[in-house]
UniProtKB/Swiss-Prot annotation:
The lineage of its organism: Bacteria, Bacillati, Actinomycetota, Actinomycetes, Mycobacteriales. It comes from the Bacteria. Residues 40-68 are annotated as: Disordered. Keywords: Toxin-antitoxin system. It comes from Mycobacterium tuberculosis (strain CDC 1551 / Oshkosh). This is Putative antitoxin VapB44. Possibly the antitoxin component of a type II toxin-antitoxin (TA) system. Its cognate toxin is VapC44 (Potential). The gene is vapB44.
């Protein structure tokens, strides 16, 4: 079903990025996330106010530092 919604820029950016990574549409991602939230599937612990940034909880630390060289290499690989 098609509809028009106003979505915050940061939310849309996150949805589009996830859709790109999962090779799905933004609509599919939003539908799944809304369905999970509305049916309380996969409940996530609430981020504390100081941990949350624009409503998104930071990803857990995976080890290693992110350097400018790494960022440049990833940009080159993704043609960004």
């Amino acid at each position: 079903m098609r509809t028009t919604l106003s979505i915050d820029d940061d939310v849309l950016l996150a949805v589009k990025e996830r859709a790109r990574r999962e090779k799905r549409t933004a609509g599919e991602i939003l539908s799944d996330l809304a369905r999970q939230a509305l049916t309380n599937q996969n409940p996530q612990p609430a981020a504390s106010q100081e941990d949350a940034f624009h409503g998104f909880e930071p990803l857990p630390h995976r080890g290693g530092a992110v350097s400018n060289a790494l960022i440049d290499r990833l940009r080159d690989e993704e043609a960004v």
